[in-house]
């Protein structure tokens, strides 16, 4: 996040927190976000555990296991400590003294020891080797070395991946945890993943500064409530008390018009700019954003409105 801040010092920046199972790590990430000049914290509710993604499973697609996409963590001092603790504990066996185990432990055991079961043979495949090299290449963040050879020999790069997979999320997240975030940062808190008006009410009662209606782009549950269906009820429940951000399924400017007309304060995009990035890099992202804004402008004109403030339910008709 510090590198992003340096690259775009004048831009508005939000830090999206995936609530880790380590509170020390959560606190560290939020402190870094505030120190780097972020304007608000987005607490993610829609991915407290990963959904059943059959295509990802079929393709064995999880870049995190290759050390990709975890730079926010490998640049964190608390995460570094977790990684080093993991490597120090690797291979160690917890031993308990006889006195601690009680009198029964002092009796002689005449049972012959069982032969240790042999470990299954390790099969090195080209894909496994390639994955190991990728992890090593990303390992400089935790080893401090840019030498591929040293990173291949070090246990830290692999331990970083294992640590990330272990602490990345917590299914046990509750409403009470929001109070911790207030202790860790003074930045405004946006709650992302609201699709039910009752949850919007609870969010307001918890004192959040904004609500983000999202189903994580439909990636978590195929049969999830469409965010556009959730927006009107949530907007009525919020009643203008806090801003509402909207995403999931937005592909063009006309989608933005509909969301704004139904009460969204702001609209976020995900896949469209990723498509542009994949096709043409930075220029592709710029073109996608330009096209969305152009379609937004033209759609408003065709609907007979001249400003976003004029957009309301009156410009829509239920199909």
Give residue ranges: language-model regions:
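Receiver (REC) domain switch/active-site residues of two-component response regulators
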Residues: 39, 209, 265
């Amino acid at each position: 996040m510090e590198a992003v801040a340096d690259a775009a010092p004048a831009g508005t920046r939000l830090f999206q927190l995936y609530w880790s199972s380590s509170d020390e790590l959560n606190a560290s990430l939020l402190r870094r976000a505030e120190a780097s000049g972020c304007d608000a914290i987005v607490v993610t509710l829609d991915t407290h555990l990963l959904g059943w993604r059959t295509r990802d499973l079929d393709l064995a697609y999880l870049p995190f296991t290759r050390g990709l996409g975890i730079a926010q963590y490998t640049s964190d001092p608390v995460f570094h400590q977790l990684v080093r603790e993991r490597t120090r504990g690797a291979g160690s066996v917890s031993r308990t003294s006889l006195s601690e185990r009680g009198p029964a432990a002092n009796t002689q055991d005449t049972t012959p020891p069982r032969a240790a079961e042999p470990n299954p043979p390790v099969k090195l495949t080209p894909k496994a080797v390639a994955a190991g090299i990728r992890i090593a290449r990303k390992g400089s963040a935790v080893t401090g070395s840019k030498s591929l050879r040293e990173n291949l020999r070090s246990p830290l790069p692999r331990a970083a991946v294992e640590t990330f997979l272990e602490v990345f999320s917590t299914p046990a997240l509750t409403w009470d945890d929001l109070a911790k975030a207030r202790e860790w940062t003074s930045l405004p808190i946006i709650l992302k993943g609201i699709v039910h008006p009752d949850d919007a009410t609870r969010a307001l009662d918890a004192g959040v500064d904004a609500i983000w209606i999202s189903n994580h782009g439909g990636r978590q549950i195929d049969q999830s409530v469409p965010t556009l269906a959730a927006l009107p009820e949530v907007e009525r429940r919020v009643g203008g008390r806090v801003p509402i951000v909207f995403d999931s399924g937005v592909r063009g400017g006309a989608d933005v018009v509909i969301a704004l007309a139904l009460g969204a304060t702001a609209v976020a995009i995900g896949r469209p700019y990723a498509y542009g990035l994949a096709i043409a890099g930075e220029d592709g992202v710029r073109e996608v954003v330009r096209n969305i804004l152009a379609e937004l402008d033209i759609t408003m004109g065709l609907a007979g409105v001249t400003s976003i403030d004029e957009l309301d339910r009156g410009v829509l008709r239920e199909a």
